[in-house]
Amino acid sequence: MQRDKLREVRGTKDLLGIELYKFQYIHRLSQSIAHRYGFIAVDTPIIEFTEVFTKTLGDDSDIVMKEMYNFQDKSGENITLRPEFTSAIVRVLINKNLIIPVKLFSSGPVFRYERPQKCRQRQFHQVNFEFFGSDLPLADIEMIALGYHILDELKLLDDITLEINFLGDKETMNSYKLSLIEYLNKYKKDLSEDSQRRLITNPLRILDSKAPEDREILLNVPNISYFYSKSSNDFFAEVLYGLDELCIPYKVNHSIVRGLDYYCNTVFEFTTSKLGAQNAVVAGGRYDGLVKSMGGNDTPAVGFAMGVERVSALIDYKHQEPRSVVLIPIGKDAVSYALKLAYELRCNGISVNWNYKNANLRNALRKVGDDNIVLIFGDEELKNNTIQVKDMKTGEQQEIVRCDLLDTLCNKI
């Protein structure tokens, strides 16, 4: 095989050592907190029928138009590597006839064909939270509180801002769209090519544009709050009141719309200034019409996703493994004995390494880490039923009888 083909595919990354430990820590902590909030875990395949996403994300969304990994399998079915979790979780809800209300936690890799940059890969990882079955502001408040709680336990709140917006009900959205179209039509020729197309297909999506030519025009866009119906205004006020009651600080940002068609009403992002353009660490909102649009019952829902790579880049995590034991057998009989000893110690929860052969003591000790505990034994030790125990951290070495070995190791590890 060509050497070039042994590298990582562009936009993907191997995880080893501390990077992998950080990912595992973020997942464990998130799942633990999700359990406290009444969530149950669900796992979905990384492949879905393409229609699961095209019917829900919006035909003109960046994900559907530019970023999905699509292929036909050998039976001719159109298949997609999942670009996000929510649509797949809704499929599970409908397919398994889950009883609502229900809270679902999921995690794993997702795939989007994007230009790789800091904290933005083509394969990346998310932890995902979905709450199906409540149309009350309290559900929105609790989901935001869950995101805040996780970031708090990750010790990230010092540089995190909760930004929140309210897109409103259908009445609000329809009124605002008309005003937005009227405003943007004045600058149609100056908009990016994508935004000119979206002005016809989905003008709200323009608010999420990152194109420099669009950002300047959007500075003076009409404020959506002026178009709230009474029910929208009351709902948003209750959400903000609930956040105040929980002492969760926030900033109302009416430019947040989220990039997917299924969002409505409350939308929010937890952002940081430490990651450049990829500043959203947690993002989500309400998607009351999604389940029905996929063929299920009319089910209100709210949820969010957290980017694991982005959180990993921010946290200060020190991984500490229990100390390991290294066996140094000297002589043929000692090698045979080492096999049985290693198995016994591992069955008692102790990490054991050895190189499966008769060792030269001096050379073997040079290769042992400073934090390890070394067990040395040869013909003399086997005859006397003893073992030499050397603590590499302190340099102390002692001979102990075999029956005391487990107690001795447990005191040192």
Curated annotation (Swiss-Prot):
What GO terms are given for molecular function?
A: ATP binding; histidine-tRNA ligase activity
Top enzyme class, one word, equals ligase
Q: Which UniProt keywords apply?
A: Aminoacyl-tRNA synthetase, ATP-binding, Cytoplasm, Ligase, Nucleotide-binding, Protein biosynthesis
What's its catalytic activity? tRNA(His) + L-histidine + ATP = L-histidyl-tRNA(His) + AMP + diphosphate + H(+)
* Biological process terms in GO annotation: histidyl-tRNA aminoacylation
User: Where is the protein localized?
Assistant: Cytoplasm
Checking CDD domains in the record gives:
HisRS-like_core, HisRS_anticodon
Disulfide bond in keyword set: no
Gene Ontology cellular-component terms for this entry are: cytoplasm
Q: What is its EC number?
A: 6.1.1.21
Q: What domain of life does the UniProt record list for this protein's source?
A: Bacteria
Q: What is its main location?
A: cytoplasm
NCBIfam families, per database record: hisS
Q: How does it assemble?
A: Homodimer.
Q: Which family does it belong to?
A: Belongs to the class-II aminoacyl-tRNA synthetase family.
The protein, known as:
Histidine--tRNA ligase
Which source organism? Ehrlichia chaffeensis (strain ATCC CRL-10679 / Arkansas)
Show the taxonomic lineage. Answer: Bacteria, Pseudomonadati, Pseudomonadota, Alphaproteobacteria, Rickettsiales
Q: By which gene is this protein encoded?
A: hisS
